[in-house]
Amino acid sequence: MKRTFAFALTIFLCLGFLFGFGSKEELPTAIDPANPSPQDEDFLFSQRIVSLVPSVTETLFAIDAQDMIVARTDFCTWPPEVAAIPSVGGFDGKTISLERILSFKPDLVCLAEVMHNHLIQPLEDLGIEVFVSNAESVQHIQDEILMLGSFTGKMDDTMLLLDTISWQLEQARIQATEKATAESPDTVYWEVAAAPYFTPGKDSFITDLLAVIGLENIFAQVPQAYPQVSEESIIAGQPQVIFFPDYNHQGQQAVQTIARRAGWQTLPAVINGKIFPVDSDLFSRPGPRIGEMALQLVDLIYGLPPQLEGAP
C-alpha cells in the first residue's frame, strides 16, 4: 500500500529563511482532502514517524501522537518537549540524508515539498509511506491536521483540536469586525525578507489568514507562495499595516529601521505607526497554532487582549 499526500506548505525559515520560492509542482494525491480517512482494508496506523516539517511535528504533539515520532529536524523546536527526540539534521534537504532517515526505521515520513522533493521517490521505492505537507490556506491547514489524525488513530484529540482552532478563528473574526471602523487599516504588506524583498503571495497561508480577519495583502494576487517584489511596488501599494517576522528579536529597533527607509515615509503604515514585529517561528509554521496567530494579529491591530472565555 502506498499513500503520497500533497497539500501546500512553505516554511520560510531555513538557516534564517526557511522558505521556498517559485511555483509548486503538482504531486499525486491518493486520498481526497474532503474525505481524508484511509479506506484501504489493510490500513494500519503509523507507529514510527520521521517528521521533517516543524508544523507537522507540532501537530503530532497537539493531537497526542508525539510518542510515534522517532526523529525530527533541528528546526522542529516546538513544543519544548520535542528536544528529547533525536534529530536527522537541518531542515534543508542538503543536510538530511536518506540513510539517516532510514536508520530510524520509519513507516511514515512527513516532508515539505519544496525542500524534500528529492526524497519522495526513493522512500516510496522502499515501501515507506510519504506525507507531503503543503498548506496554502487556513482550510488546507485544518485538512492536513485531520489527515494526520486519521493516520495516527488520534481522531478524538484531532477533533478537539480542530474545534479549538475553529473557535479561535471565529473569535478573531468577530473581534476584528466589532472593532473595525471606517478609519481602521485594511491593507497589509507582510515582509518576509528585505533587499531583495520577499512577501507572501497568492499561494501563502499568510494571505488567507489575513483575509480571515478582514485584512488584504497588497500582493494577494501575485502568483507563488513567496514571490520576490520590488521596493517600488511596495511603495505603490500604500499599505496601511506592515508586519514582519522579528528573526533577530530586535523589536522596536527593527520597526525604526523599516520606518526610516528612503521613500517609505509616505506609507500610511509608517505615518500611523502601524509597523508590527511578529514571532518568526510561530508565523512560519502553518499548523495547530493558526488560531493563535489570528488572535495575535487582531491584538496587534486593535490593541485588544485575547478574549478566550468560552473556549472549547
Predicted features along the sequence, with ranges:
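A ligand-binding cleft/hinge motif common to bilobed small-molecule-binding domains
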Residues: M115-D125, V241-A259
